[in-house]
Every structure is written in C-alpha cells, then in structure tokens.
Amino acid sequence: MAPEINLPGPMSLIDNTKGQLVVNPEALKILSAITQPVVVVAIVGLYRTGKSYLMNKLAGKKNGFSLGSTVKSHTKGIWMWCVPHPKKPEHTLVLLDTEGLGDIEKGDNENDSWIFALAILLSSTFVYNSMGTINQQAMDQLHYVTELTDRIKANSSPGNNSVDDSADFVSFFPAFVWTLRDFTLELEVDGEPITADDYLELSLKLRKGTDKKSKSFNDPRLCIRKFFPKRKCFVFDWPAPKKYLAHLEQLKEEELNPDFIEQVAEFCSYILSHSNVKTLSGGIPVNGPRLESLVLTYVNAISSGDLPCMENAVLALAQIENSAAVEKAIAHYEQQMGQKVQLPTETLQELLDLHRDSEREAIEVFMKNSFKDVDQMFQRKLGAQLEARRDDFCKQNSKASSDCCMALLQDIFGPLEEDVKQGTFSKPGGYRLFTQKLQELKNKYYQVPRKGIQAKEVLKKYLESKEDVADALLQTDQSLSEKEKAIEVERIKAESAEAAKKMLEEIQKKNEEMMEQKEKSYQEHVKQLTEKMERDRAQLMAEQEKTLALKLQEQERLLKEGFENESKRLQKDIWDIQMRSKSLEPICNIL
C-alpha cells in the first residue's frame, strides 16, 4: 500500500517571475514521493472569476488556494495541492490552480497562452471558468484554444502541416469542463427546459459563411469541438448578495444561496467521480514522478524557446524509467540468486536452472516497470547485464568448487604425502602399497558430496603433480621386474589418456549447456516482449478506437448541422487513425 501524500495547503508548482516560467524544486520533491496514480484537475479562466473557490471545494476545504478580495489577481503561475482522492482509494488528487488570464496589470498574453497550454498538457480534466453566459465575448476570451497548434506539438517530427499534428491532440488532451459563474439565464429553448450540457452544445454551433466574421465566430468553436470531444458544462447562480462576495470563503453555508450550494456539490461530485487518472499515450498511468518529469520537460522546452512536445516528454520519461527498470530487474535477479544459490553447486546445470528462474523473474520486473523501449535498447542492456552476472556466478561457482576441493585434497591426501616424506613406501613392495593407499583416498574423495563442478579437474591436476613421486617409487621398487614396471607405465598412460578424454567430454558438455541456456534466455526475452507488445498493441488500439468514435460522433454532428466542408476536413483525421490501427502489428526484433 503506497503512502498517502496530504499537503496541508497549496504550494507553487510553476512560478511566473518577470515573464519567465520557473519550476519550484520543493513542489517537484512532493511529486517525486507520490507513487500512486494521479488524477490531475486544472482550472483556468480570466482573473477574479472565482477559480480558487471551486478548487478549495474539490480539496474539501474552505480555505487553501488564495481567493483574494480585490480586482488584483492573487494566483501567480500554477499552484498545486495534492490530497488523497476522496472517492478513489490508492489515488492522489492533484489540483492545479492557475494564474488568472487577461490580468490588465500583467498585460502578458504570451505567458497566459503558455499557462493555458501547460494546464492542458498536465491535466486529465481541464476546467475553464468564466463569468456569465457563453456569448461571443466569452468565446473571444477563449482565443487561447485557437493558439494551441502554435503552442503544442504531439510528435517530434510531424508532417508538413501542423493541423496533421494537432489531429493527435485528442488522444492525450484532457476532458473539458466549462463552468459558468453568476449565470442568470433560464436554461430553456422554445419554452422547453434544457441541460447545461445542451446549452454548451448549442453555444458551440457553427455559423455558415466564409467571411472573416464567420471565421472569427467559428474558429474557437471548431477548436473546442475538435480538441475536446468529451466536454461538460456546469452553471452556477450568484453565491450570495454582492456585498458578501469579497469574503466568500468566510461565509457560513446558511448564508450562501441554496441553489449555488447544490450546484457546487453537483460539480464536485462529477469531477471527483468522472475525472480519470492522467495517462500517457498507450494508456500508461501517470504517478507523481511521471508528472514531475512532464512538468520539467514542458517548462524546459518553453524556456529554451521550443514548443512543448508530448512525444518528446514521453520519450524523456521513458529514458528515466527504463533505466530504473533495468536497475530494479538486476537488483531482483541478484536478490533471488543470493537467496537460492549455495556455492558450489553440484553441477553447472543446477546453477543454470537457478539462473533461468531468476532471469525470468527479472525480465518480468523489467517489463512491468518499462514502457516505450524504442528498439528494445534497454531490454538489450538488461540482457547483457544478466549474461554478465550469469558468467560472474559461473566464475564464482568454479572458484568455490576449486577452493573446496583443494582444501579437501589437503585434508585427505595430506597424511599420504607425509608418509612419502618419511620413506614409508621406499622399500620392496612399497609401490603397490602406495597405489593401493592412493586408490583408497581417491574413493574417499569421490564420496564427499557437494564438491562442485571442479572436483574431477582439481583431482586430475593434483594427481598429475604427484606423478614424479609415483614414478620414483615405481622405478626404485626392487620387488618389481622391468617387465612389470613397463606394464605399469603403460597402464598409467592409458589411465591418464582416459581421464583426459573424460575431461574433454566434460568441457564439451558444459559448453553445450551454456549454449542451450543462451538460447533459452533469448527465447524468454522474446516470449515476454511479444506478450508485452501484444498488451500494448491492444491498449493502443482501444485508445485509437475511442478517439475514432469521438471523431465520428463529431463528424456526424457537423453533417447534421450542414457543414460538409468541415466534415470532410475531419475525415482526414479519421482516415489517419484507421490507417494507424491497421498498421499496429507487433514487431519483435531483439538481442
């Protein structure tokens, strides 16, 4: 169970200092500690429209984000408040309150546009807050939406036409919620009641015509319809008599307009119930560290004069996380091998079987923690590191076996060596006595368990080192005839040749086992990669089908409204999505 992060109040995430956007390191520390998936709700709107009040309500607090009580905008840059999600256990709600747009004292439309774009890029639900009704003035104030293609890139290498790039916006843009404060109209058309959502859709209807006025009317509406196919609207009555509005957060509930209280409750309930976890392309859920990386990547891009690019942000994040995934996988492998392996192992195959089990688990850890591993670069690194660690364990195993056998030989054959020095076998019949004793000790050595894979080789080398002793005893033993000595020499040669042959077979067997293990390792990498790619492909297809359904829905609306040309333009986006879905075939080229 991941620990909860519950900030007592908001803190600055991105400062707007002298026209420069600067990330607050303390806020990044908070984000880096949030291991839970995050639901990110951002609110944007003109200054002094009561954005902060709604965000405090979402946090379940009366105070928090600064409301201010004058015509001056209080919030500067983007402020963040992280609280446990009240309706989704094991999730963190991240609320982003933004600097009021259109502040006359600030007079910086450039920064307003960047704050608007950042709020969209960072959130899973984007709330646009405005006063009164949705009229042309309200649409004109929302001109930032028409500038999104000049502020955001979906891909690092889009086509020649920026509109082609913007066609991908839908796949990672947030849900759009328009909140209308101090709304005084009756929600009805031709005497029939309508919902706030109906009112929004009616307000987004296009005007026929190709003149400049029609274009100005249609452009923001088209952008909202194109970029935010999932949209919602809430209207709010006056919260209280005008004289109390400056101190809204201090009012008791009974002093507020009951309709306003009900409307705020409905808004909060919807946002908390329907706002999704922030995701990256392919449905990858965002947690605190991932959100931290997105903030840094986007703000750094803006500061360096580039456009924030979703693809670049994801790839930068993938580099960080995939590198960490390799480290996690290797740590898991070493932990498992440390627990399971007792050196020396009786056979090489015993060690390789333990390696294979630990390797399989390590690859699983990597697959679970990695994403967007372009050309399987990090999986290749993992494979190389696992192979190096396997070889290291093999070396350790050989050394442990050699050390064990050398100590055992000293223990078993030490007394025999002492007898040789004392001349015990330097007498007639001594050679026979020596070879008999040697065979007894060899049998004793063979019977000792868990000597490891070097047992035969260490014994062979030891016996070879004592051949001069045996030969001297043979040649000086007066009880043996020259013929018997010659026969014994030939027997020793044959025995040595047989031992060498067996050693060669043993080495060949080890090489075959290593080659077989390498093939099994490769197949395990391929198997798990194929399964992951299939899961990713299914996720991407589901995401594209969802986007396609929303595009088709919008196309149908345009046709019903009689805007055939706009429908045809949208058809290109639809074809692009359909072609991409067809091309989503798993490709597996690794190692």
From Swiss-Prot:
A lipid is attached at C588 (S-geranylgeranyl cysteine). Residues 35-276 form the GB1/RHD3-type G domain. The modification Cysteine methyl ester is found at C588. Induction: By IFNG/IFN-gamma during macrophage activation, and by TNF and IL1B. Its main location: membrane. GO terms for biological process: activation of innate immune response; cellular response to interleukin-1; cellular response to lipopolysaccharide; cellular response to tumor necrosis factor; cellular response to type II interferon; cytolysis in another organism; defense response to bacterium; defense response to Gram-positive bacterium. Residues 1-309 are annotated as: GTPase domain (Globular). It is a lipid-anchor. (Microbial infection) Ubiquitinated by S.flexneri IpaH9.8, leading to its degradation by the proteasome, thereby preventing its ability to promote host defense against bacterial infection. Its EC number is 3.6.5.-. Pfam families: GBP, GBP_C. PANTHER family: GUANYLATE BINDING PROTEIN (PTHR10751). Homodimer; homodimerization occurs upon GTP-binding and is required for the association with membranous structures. Heterodimer with other family members, including GBP1, GBP3, GBP4 and GBP5. This is Guanylate-binding protein 2. It comes from Homo sapiens (Human). The gene is GBP2.
